[in-house]
A protein has these predicted regions:
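N-terminal hydrophobic targeting signals that begin at the initiator methionine
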Residues: 1-2
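Jelly-roll (double-stranded beta-helix
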Residues: 5-143, 150-208
């Protein structure tokens, strides 16, 4: 091939490559929402439930050993250190208090149900805006207390949202649901469960 013609072809290819680069977006394409993370922090089994309408009482303690001592003295209390604070969670009647603790919230009334054995479970959960769980169900009820961000819960009954510093009581056993981070900042929340201990704590589900 003629050297001049070869040089011309190289020049045309170079111009076309510059044109193609100019068509590329100037900023990266937005990534998919991050992962919704769920961590187990405490659990305890019960043979039976306390009488009367039940609430989750949430309290802060100065030190973890104090909260653990209080939890050891109560069959329906659990202690955990989450998000830089020490927490005591107690399932019981409304209006109670634990010596040495500072009450943060009472969440309820919690839906109750019959079971051969019960499991109290506390999860720490959350994620960036747009993150969500798969559709699932539990053999019991769950309640939420939001530390930061906004939690959303989608069920066949609709969508409920709760902001930081507020609580939300979920539905009873076997309700299909999807939980998501619905705000503009990362979700950080505590999730309190009353479950049938003889069944899997969570199973896949679907919306009909």
């Amino acid at each position: 091939m003629n050297p001049r013609r070869l040089d011309a072809w190289y020049f045309i290819a170079w111009v076309l490559s510059l044109f193609a680069m100019a068509l590329l977006p100037s900023s990266p394409v937005a990534a998919e929402p991050g992962q919704f993370i769920v961590s187990l922090v405490a659990e305890k089994k019960l043979n039976g439930l306390p009488p009367g309408p039940l609430y989750w009482r949430i309290e802060n303690f100065p030190a973890l050993d104090q909260a653990q001592s209080a939890a050891a003295a109560s069959p329906t209390s659990l202690a955990a250190a989450v998000s830089g604070k020490v927490w005591l969670f107690t399932l019981g009647q409304k209006g109670g208090a634990t010596p040495g603790g500072t009450k943060v919230a009472e969440v309820g009334p919690v839906p109750v149900f019959a079971a051969p054995e019960y499991l109290l479970r506390i999860n720490h959960a959350g994620g960036p805006p747009g993150s969500k769980t798969p559709v699932h169900s539990h053999p019991g009820s769950e309640s939420f207390y939001v530390l930061a961000g906004q939690v959303g819960q989608r069920t066949p009954h609709g969508v409920n949202r709760t902001e930081a510093g507020q609580s939300m009581v979920g539905h009873g056993p076997d309700m299909p649901m999807e939980v998501f981070s619905g705000g503009t900042t990362d979700l950080d929340q505590l999730v309190m469960f009353l479950l049938d201990a003889t069944r899997p704590a969570s199973v896949p589900a679907k919306f009909e």
